[in-house]
C-alpha cells in the first residue's frame, strides 16, 4: 500500500494520430552539462567538477548521485572500458575483465546543480540521466592534453597516465590497440 501524491501540473505530450494539434512538442531539451577534470602531478584523475542544468532539483541528493554515477561511467568509457566483439560475440563474459572502474579508482566528484526550471517539465525538472555522461571523455582528453601535450582521439585512452593508474581488469589474450595521435 503506497501513497498517492497528486501534482498540480498535468503533462500531456501526446496527440492521437490524425488529430490536429495546435502546439506540437516533440521533446523537452536539456540545458547543459559541463565538466572539468583535474589531474595530479603524475597525470592521475584527482577530481572532477561537474556543473549540470537539471531544471528544478526536486531531489537534490538524487540528482547529485545520478551525476556522480554518470561521471563514473564516463571515466570508464574514456579511460579503461572495452568490450571487443570479434565475429559479433563478446571476447569475454566476465564483467571484471572489461575495465569497469572500481570504487577505489573513483576520484572526488564535485557536483554543481544549476537550476533553470523547465516551464513545461514536471515540477520544472529536466532529465539528469544520460546527459551526465556526455562531457566526461572530452574533459578527460582535454586534461590529458594539458598534462602531456598528446591529443588522443581513440577511446578508451588506455595509453594515458590516468588510465594506467586505474586498477581495472583486462581481457586475457587481447592485444592492446595502438592509439591514434596527432
Task: Label the predicted regions.
Residues 1-182:
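C-terminal catalytic domains of large/alpha subunits in multi-subunit enzymes
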Amino acid at each position: 500500500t503506497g501513497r498517492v501524491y497528486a501534482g498540480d501540473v498535468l503533462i500531456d505530450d501526446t496527440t492521437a494520430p490524425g488529430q490536429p494539434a495546435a502546439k506540437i512538442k516533440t521533446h523537452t531539451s536539456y540545458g547543459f552539462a559541463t565538466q572539468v577534470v583535474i589531474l595530479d602531478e603524475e597525470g592521475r584523475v584527482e577530481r572532477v567538477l561537474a556543473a549540470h542544468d537539471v531544471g528544478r532539483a526536486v531531489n537534490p541528493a538524487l540528482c547529485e548521485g545520478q551525476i556522480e554515477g554518470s561521471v563514473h561511467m564516463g571515466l570508464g568509457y574514456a579511460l579503461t572500458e572495452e568490450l571487443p566483439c570479434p565475429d559479433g560475440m563478446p571476447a569475454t563474459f566476465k564483467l571484471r575483465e572489461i575495465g569497469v572502474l572500481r570504487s577505489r579508482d573513483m576520484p572526488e566528484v564535485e557536483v554543481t546543480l544549476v537550476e533553470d526550471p523547465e516551464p513545461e517539465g514536471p515540477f520544472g525538472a529536466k532529465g539528469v540521466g544520460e546527459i551526465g555522461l556526455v562531457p566526461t571523455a572530452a574533459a578527460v582528453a582535454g586534461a590529458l592534453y594539458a598534462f602531456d601535450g598528446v591529443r588522443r582521439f581513440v577511446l578508451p585512452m588506455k595509453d594515458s597516465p590516468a588510465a594506467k593508474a586505474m586498477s581495472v581488469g583486462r581481457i586475457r589474450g587481447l592485444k592492446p590497440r595502438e592509439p591514434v595521435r596527432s
